[in-house]
Design a protein with these regions (language model features):
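Catalytic core of the metallo-beta-lactamase
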Residues: 28-104, 110
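Short glycine/proline- and charge-enriched loop/turn segments
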Residues: 23-26, 84-87, 132-140
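Generic beta-sheet signal
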Residues: 1-3, 80-81, 119
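Divalent-metal (often Zn2+) His-rich catalytic cores of metallo-beta-lactamase-fold enzymes
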Residues: 71, 77, 100-141
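Short, glycine/charged-enriched secondary-structure capping and boundary segments
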Residues: 5-8, 75-76, 93-95, 130-133
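Active-site HxH/HxHxD metal-binding segment of metal-dependent hydrolases
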Residues: 1-47, 138
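General structural signal for secondary-structure boundaries
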Residues: 3, 35, 94, 112, ...
Length: 141
């Protein structure tokens, strides 16, 4: 995958982005990720069945275009990805959309769940997620 389709170039420019090399021959300049083959494009409301779990696809754009979350209503789990996490929510990356991010925060205030697995940091509960969303909406508004 070409760097222009990722943010890899930003991480290569930050020596602290990788704490230590996985082996002596590893080089961040030569590192490449091979994309998994596309099986299908997911859309709002689609279901993903894993055998023992079912996830509803929820469109959560703003941080990055096309971001999704996965909601397991039976277990109360929300896989939120980079849509929300502790700390300053980033809405100024290439491809970010602050207006769409505000709509995502509004949406997250309405979703019922027990715990959210975020793309960064620890698992959070619904109360903390809603506090983060409200803080973003208050500061961005």
């Amino acid at each position: 995958m070409a760097d222009e389709h990722t943010l890899a170039h930003l991480f290569r420019a930050q020596p602290q982005a990788v704490g230590r090399s996985p082996n002596e021959a590893w080089s961040p300049q030569r590192f490449r990720l091979s994309p998994a083959p596309l099986a299908r494009i997911l859309d709002e409301g689609d279901m993903i069945e894993t055998g023992d779990r079912s996830f509803h696809v929820i469109h959560l754009p703003g941080h990055s275009p096309g971001s999704i979350g996965l909601l397991d209503e039976r277990n109360g789990d929300l896989l939120a990805g980079d849509a929300i996490y502790r700390g300053r929510l980033i809405d100024d990356l290439p491809g970010s959309d602050a207006l769409a991010y505000r709509q995502t925060m509004q949406r997250l205030l309405q979703i019922e769940f027990s715990r959210a697995f975020c793309g960064h940091g620890e698992t959070i509960d619904q109360i903390e997620l809603r506090a983060i969303a409200r803080t973003y909406l208050d500061s961005a508004g």
